[in-house]
Amino acid sequence: MIDLHVHFPMRLLGGVESPRDVIKGMTRVRGREDGKLRAAVLAIAARLFNFRDWDGTWRVTPQLLEQGEVSIACSVLYRPFSEMDLDEPYGSPPESAYYPKLIELLEATEAEVARTGGVTVRTAADLDQPGQRYVHCIEGGFHLGATPEDVTANVHELADRGVLYITLAHLFWRRVAANTPALPFLPDAIYNLVFPQNKDAALSELGEAAVKAMYERKVLVDISHMRDDAIDETFALIEALDKETGRDPRAYPVIASHSGYRFGGQKYNLSDRTIVRIAVRGGVVGLIFAQHQINDGLRRTETKTLGESVAILARHIDAIGPQHVALGSDLDGFIKPTLGGIETAADLAPLAAALKSRYPAEADDILENNARRVIAARFA
C-alpha cells in the first residue's frame, strides 16, 4: 500500500539540530532563544488539533506504518514556523532562511529513516528495495527561496535529493500561490475575511519559477490547497511547457496529493474541471482523511465507524473514478478529527481490507498502482 501524503517528519520538529522525538524534546530546542516558545506552541497545537486526546501521541511512526501495511510512505516535509513566521506580518514574501531549515528537517528525516531500518527513495531502483520506503515530498512553496533564481536552484537540489512533489500553496498566503481555506475550526467566509489574498496574484513570479524548475527536473506539482485561479494558471503554464518541449502530457502527471471531490461548498475539494485535467495527464487525487473536507456536502455529522468512513470514501472514489484515486491520508497533518475508525497509520490495514471487499477489481489500483504510476513517472 502507498500513502501519497503522510506527515512522518512532523514528530521530528522538536529536534532542530538532530532528530529526536518532538514530544520529549519540545522544551529542549537549541540554537535560538525563541525556539523553546515555538516548540511549546507546536506541542500544544499537536494536542489540540492533531492527537486524539490531550495525552495522545503521533499517528505516524515506522511501527504504525508497518502495522498498517504501508510499504511506501510519501513523507511530507513542512516547517510550520516558516509558514507562520511570527516575526513577519501576514502575507509577507518568503525569506531565504526558510530553505536551510527545510534541508535540516530533510536530513533529520533521512537519519531517522536509516535508524529505523527504512529506505529513503532517491532513484527508481530504491522503490523496489525491501522494507519500508520513504519518498520526500514538500508542503509549501514558501520553503523554496526568496527570489526566482534561488527557487530554481533549490528545486534542482531537491530533485537531486529525490523529492517526489511539491505542494506550492498551503494554509496561508505567502506570495507563491493563492490558497483555499482549509482550517477545520474556521469557516471559509471568516477565513477569507481574516486572511485576505491578492485576487490578481494567483501564481506569483516565485510560483512560476518553481513550476518551471519542477517541470524541468520532473518533480511533480501538487495542486492541493490551491485556489481555482491558481490551479488554472498552473495548468496553463505546464501545458505551455508541454508545447515548448514536445513532452507527452502523461509523462508529467499533475496530482492533488490530499483532497477530494467537491460535493459541497468548500473550495478546498476539487471541481469536475480540475479532476478531468488531472486525469488527462494520468495524475491522481489522494483522498484526505480529514472529516472537515471529506464529509463536506455529504453528511453533517462525523463518521464514527470504519464502515461509515468507507461509505464516504466510496462516494469520492466513484465521483473521481477508481483509476485516478489514491490514499492521501494527511495523518499527523493537524487534521483532527480524522475519519471514524482511522486514528493512526496502523488503521490503514483494516481500511485496505474494507476497500478490497467493496472494490474487488479496482482496490489494488486505489491502494497502490495509481500512486505508483505517478511516482514511476517522477523517477523515470
What are these regions (language model features)?
Residues 1, 202-203, 259:
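Exposed regions on extracellular, virion, or secretory-pathway luminal proteins
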Residues 76, 223-224, 257-258:
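Short His-Asn-centered micro-motif
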Residues 226, 259-261, 289-291:
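Histidine- and/or cysteine-centered catalytic micro-motif in compact active-site loops
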Residues 192-235:
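Loop-centered beta-sheet repeat module
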Residues 1-196, 209-212, 216, 238-243, ...:
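N-terminal hydrophobic targeting/anchoring segments and the immediately downstream early-domain regions
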